[in-house]
Structure formats: structure tokens, C-alpha cells
Amino acid sequence: MQNKIPHVIVCDDDAELNSFMRNHFKLDGYETHQALSAQECIDKLAELGDTIDAITVDGKIASDRSIMLIVNVRRMNKNVKVFVLADKGLSEDKVRMMDYGADEFTVKPISMESIINKVNLQLLEAARSAVAS
């Protein structure tokens, strides 16, 4: 987030919710990108590469697909922040997602303000770490 517009991919198969989330990120100064499936998310990340700073992933995308998405994202871009937004908070799901590389696992309902704050915080911490290195 070093004086550049942060880019986020919103990966949610609900088109209305995806649009709603992207609009809120835009209002907070983000450049947003839509993905309605795990494959679209991978394709978008392949297209945009290191310009992507964060990805929000809907936990409704089957757990195994979400895990494979996270694994593939990590292979493509180790620095992107991955946020899983789940409908339920089973501890084993959270542990698995975090073990495979998710940066945050949050259970819905959660306000957009809270989601954006979590993303902002992770990006700020990453920028500070990059400066300190």
C-alpha cells in the first residue's frame, strides 16, 4: 500500500453480494476485481499478478475448493492477503484454511466496515514489514 491504489479481488458466487462488497471497497479507495468462482479468481490473479494486494473468498465455495484456491494463490503470489469469509466457524475449517495460507478467517455476519478494516490492517502491516526488511 505504498502510495498506490490497493487492488482487491472479491471472490463470491453471489453476484449481488459481490457487487455490494466491491462498491464498498471502491468507496474506501480500492481498485476492485470480480470473481464469481475459484477458477475466475485464479484467472484474474494470473492476469493481474502482483498488482493484487488482497483477495476475499466466500467460504460457501466448497471447503476443498477454497483450500485449493488458497494453495494456488500462494503459488502465484506469496504476498497477497487472503481473507476467508465463512458462514460457519468450525474450528477445524479455520485451522485448515490458515494452515494452507489464509491470512484471516472470519465468520459472517460481519459488517463491510469491519472487513475493510481487517484488509487495511493486513496491508498496512505488510507495508511496514517490507520497509523494515
Predicted regions and their residues:
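Conserved phosphotransfer microenvironments
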Residues: 52, 56-73
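C-terminal output helix
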Residues: 92, 110-119, 127
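Acidic, metal-coordinating helix/loop segments flanking the phosphotransfer/catalytic sites
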Residues: 34-54
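Negatively charged, flexible loop motifs adjacent to catalytic sites
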Residues: 40, 62, 88-92
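Two-component/phosphorelay signaling modules centered on CheY-like receiver
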Residues: 15-34
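Alpha4 helix (beta4-alpha4-beta5 surface) of REC/receiver domains from two-component response regulators
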Residues: 68, 89-105
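Conserved phosphotransfer cores of two-component systems
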Residues: 46-50, 73-79, 100, 121
